[in-house]
């Protein structure tokens, strides 16, 4: 199993810079075509082309593996591995000329949907993060770990908002206000994979968000876990890429955050 994971990881760590270069070049062009999947959910021709590049590479080199991707959906495979792909996380940032976007490619065990490989590239930040289950987390070649901050007042948090802003917005604002008043602050980057990778290397102490999809957390979630972080749902259930809410932390402030959401999360519609 380990050699199979190394093979897949090594191959894509060498391939994904090609996709990153494409996105950077496309980002410099004017007249980027944008379609709306929803009021706040955008898709560009760059998303679709980047996804095709990644999926073609998977099917050419690992034809028995399954695929789950944001734009194309599910493609069943015959092996024990399924690739989980978000070709452009942070599309709204991308369309507005901001550099905070990434390419997320994870591999999960097909039956359990447990992440075993995570790779996230940030083309215009000129860096990438990666992990193999049981082997630690890395920013490029440097090992990374979550922060050791244990108090809320010294902690910096990050969050995101679901695409449907009308769903339980009042409750979400209550979370935001309560945590903001007890901590050093809350940030929002607009890219879940960036939030998780920055948490993994100690920039943030905690992250929470509702309405995430498997491709938002398969790769970056593993990177957090391998950086000795902790992940559950916002109501404390075990981590799965299929859960509809996510709470990630350095582990030391996790129970404090769970207490903020206690008795409230089941009131949120998503």
Go through the PLM ranges and name each one:
Residues 1-88, 252, 268-270:
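N-terminal subdomain of lithium-sensitive/metallo-dependent phosphomonoesterases centered on the IMPase/IPPase/PAP
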Residues 23-24, 47, 58, 91, ...:
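Residue-level signal for inorganic ion chemistry
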Residues 29-30, 131-135, 225, 242:
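A short, compositionally biased
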Residues 35, 75-77, 110-112, 130, ...:
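Solvent-exposed alpha-helices and their adjacent loops that cap or buttress functional pockets
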Residues 48, 71, 87-90, 94, ...:
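Generic detector of well-ordered alpha-helical packing
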Residues 77-138:
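DPxDG-like acidic metal-binding loop motif
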Residues 145-270:
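An extended, acidic
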């Amino acid at each position: 199993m380990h050699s199979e994971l190394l093979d897949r990881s090594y191959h894509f760590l060498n391939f994904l810079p090609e996709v990153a270069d494409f996105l950077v070049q496309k980002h410099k062009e004017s007249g980027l075509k944008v379609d709306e999947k929803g009021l706040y959910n955008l898709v560009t021709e760059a998303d679709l082309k980047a996804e095709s590049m990644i999926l073609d590479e998977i099917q050419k080199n690992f034809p028995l593996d399954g695929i789950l991707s944001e734009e194309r959906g599910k493609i069943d495979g015959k092996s024990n591995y399924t690739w989980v792909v978000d070709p452009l996380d942070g599309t709204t940032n991308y369309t507005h000329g901001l550099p905070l976007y990434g390419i997320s490619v994870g591999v999960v065990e097909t039956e359990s949907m447990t992440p075993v490989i995570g790779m996230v590239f940030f083309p215009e930040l000129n860096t990438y993060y990666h992990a193999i289950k049981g082997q630690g987390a890395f920013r490029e070649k440097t090992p990374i770990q979550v922060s050791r901050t244990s108090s809320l007042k010294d902690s910096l948090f990050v969050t995101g908002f679901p695409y449907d802003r009308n769903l339980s917005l009042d409750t979400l604002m209550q979370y935001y206000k309560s945590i903001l008043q007890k901590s050093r602050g809350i940030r929002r980057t607009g890219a879940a994979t960036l939030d998780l990778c920055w948490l993994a290397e100690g920039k943030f102490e905690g992250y929470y968000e509702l309405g995430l999809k498997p491709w938002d957390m398969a790769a970056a979630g593993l990177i957090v876990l391998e950086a000795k972080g902790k992940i559950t749902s916002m109501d404390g259930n075990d981590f799965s890429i299929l859960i509809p809410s996510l709470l990630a932390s350095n582990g030391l402030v996790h129970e404090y955050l769970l207490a903020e959401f206690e008795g409230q999360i089941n009131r949120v519609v998503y």
